């Protein structure tokens, strides 16, 4: 696909997935796209845990977001570690956001659907529980889990506002 076709095709898929495995090569390509994202001061604070099958995902189901993860044949958990960021403002939010968007676009390009799951993991107890299951060191923080797979149901898209409702030229409110 052309880049803008991928951007326009990406959406947040919140339904069930087909029970079709995601090949390792595709998971690796999606993860590489995330790791190639812009990151502040080259801190490279993002760490990914690839959950390559349902067996790897299963221990997370009782923690949070069961309805979004249960049918996913694969997922990627996005963590950040800011322990090496000492003398400058912490940009881990920007770093993991850029990595996550790159992975969503890469998944779309390969024909998969996904959704950015973060809300359920804002709860510190849930975050620590996921980290414990995945054996993640305490200096890392769970930011997002991306379930990945082929959609089993028709896509449901929310309409986007018109371009000129969200864009101004030179000064706020001015249009071309």
Where are these regions (language model features)?
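Acidic, surface-exposed loops and disordered segments
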Residues: 1-176
């Amino acid at each position: 696909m052309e880049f803008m076709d991928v951007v326009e095709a990406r959406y947040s898929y919140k339904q069930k997935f087909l029970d079709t495995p995601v090949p390792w090569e595709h998971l690796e390509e999606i993860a590489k796209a995330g790791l190639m994202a812009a990151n502040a001061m080259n801190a490279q604070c993002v760490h990914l845990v690839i959950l390559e099958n349902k067996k790897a995902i299963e221990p997370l189901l009782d923690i949070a977001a069961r309805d979004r993860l249960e049918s996913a044949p694969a997922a990627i958990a996005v963590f950040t570690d800011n322990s090496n960021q000492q003398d400058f403002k912490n940009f881990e939010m920007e770093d993991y956001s850029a990595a996550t968007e790159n992975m969503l676009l890469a998944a779309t390009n390969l024909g998969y659907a996904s959704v950015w799951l973060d809300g359920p993991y804002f709860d510190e107890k849930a975050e620590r529980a996921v980290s414990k299951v995945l054996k993640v060191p305490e200096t890392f923080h769970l930011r997002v889990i991306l379930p990945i797979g082929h959609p089993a149901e028709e896509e449901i898209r929310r309409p986007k506002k018109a371009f000129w409702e969200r864009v101004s030229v030179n000064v706020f409110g001015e249009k071309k």
